[in-house]
Amino acid sequence: MSDNNQATTNASVLTGRVVSDKMDKSITVLIERLVRHPLYGKQLRRSTKIKAHDENNVCQQGDLVRIKETRPISKTKSWTLVDVVEKVEKI
């Protein structure tokens, strides 16, 4: 038997913009991706909104964040905040 001290994870990590931070300990992240049209081959922009857990309420609207998939936290939250890649400037 081999020694397996390292825990392997298959959790996906995504990067997106925070579009809402009005909920307590939660953020809404907009994930954009490019999809090729099956017939014409044109690149189309598709987006998905994902709710993620922000334990310390560190994010604000406009931040670029990295989130990872985790166990279900609530009915709609199965993602958690990994880190803030880029903070938005306050005006």
Curated annotation (Swiss-Prot):
GO terms for molecular function: rRNA binding; structural constituent of ribosome. One of its GO terms (cellular component) is cytosolic small ribosomal subunit. Pfam families: Ribosomal_S17 (PF00366). GO terms for biological process: translation. Keywords: Ribonucleoprotein, Ribosomal protein, RNA-binding, rRNA-binding. The keyword RNA-binding applies. PROSITE patterns: RIBOSOMAL_S17 (PS00056). It comes from the Bacteria. InterPro entries: NA-bd_OB-fold, Ribosomal_uS17, Ribosomal_uS17_bact/chlr, Ribosomal_uS17_CS. Belongs to the universal ribosomal protein uS17 family. Part of the 30S ribosomal subunit. One of the primary rRNA binding proteins, it binds specifically to the 5'-end of 16S ribosomal RNA. This is Small ribosomal subunit protein uS17. It comes from Psychrobacter cryohalolentis (strain ATCC BAA-1226 / DSM 17306 / VKM B-2378 / K5). The gene is rpsQ.
